[in-house]
Amino acid sequence: MRRFAARVSPYALTTGGLVLFLAIIVFGNSLGHFHTDIKPEVYLAPWTMVERYLSSWTSSPYLGSANFNVGLVPVLLLLSALRGLGLSPEWTFKVFHFALWLVAAWGANRLVRAATVRATKWVGLFAGVFYLANPYTIAAGNTLAIALPMALLPWMLLAYLRGLQQPRSWAWPAAFGLAFFAMSGMNVAVVPIYQLLMAIPVVLVLRRAWSLRWSAVASVVAKCGAFVLGLSLYWLVPSFAAQG
């Protein structure tokens, strides 16, 4: 045991302890009871919701209504896979959210260390903890429409930052678009679209720090925008069709 402790760094022990603490909070909260942060059927029967949400028109007791939830389909496919593994709705919810919070903290860690050369791994770890353990995340993160985009925001900004470092690359703009796609288009992607505004302060700060040319910035923004638009067509087209 002592040899093992000697081989494991204090950073690894701290990180492992924090992950364990997060797991206790997520999995131990309301143990044995199912809670949801969106329509219950999303966790109860996600596979049946996929077909329903792929249509621009949804049935209801009042002759139906326009469907603006096509953007939720990627999430439904993931949840269907978890349910297919035999997880109950309660554990599907908890496993999904545990993964979300790990992704969020890891992304915040990576983003801070990439944006600030002097940031140590401990600074990155603190950034990840603070990104999760703050009043806004605790309160607003109770709804999936906010929690999912928020978890992926650091990764989207990290891809943007890397794209600015390598203006000729298409890989990082593609990663930017994929991060936006993974946020899903639920609620007509209102939250992810607002989060795109975060790119403005990032480029204003980094342009001066890295002496970037506006032409290079414009090229990266255009490529990121093209991928975002292209990967959003699956919910944009049905949403426009639902309007009329």
Where are these regions (language model features)?
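Membrane-interface coil-to-helix junctions
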Residues: 20-105, 129-151
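Start-transfer (signal-anchor) and selected internal transmembrane alpha helices
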Residues: 1-28, 219-220
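Membrane-water interface of alpha-helical transmembrane segments
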Residues: 7-12, 90, 94-97, 117-121, ...
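Periplasmic/ER-lumenal interhelical loops and adjacent helix-loop junctions
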Residues: 48-61, 65, 217-220, 224-244
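Membrane-embedded helix bundles of polyisoprenyl
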Residues: 102-115, 120-208, 220-240
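Short alpha-helical segments and helix-capping/turn motifs at coil-helix boundaries
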Residues: 3-10, 64-65, 106-111
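Coil-to-alpha-helix initiation sites in intrinsically disordered, low-complexity, charged segments
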Residues: 3, 69-72, 76, 120, ...
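Short coil/turn helix-boundary motifs
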Residues: 85-88, 166-167, 210
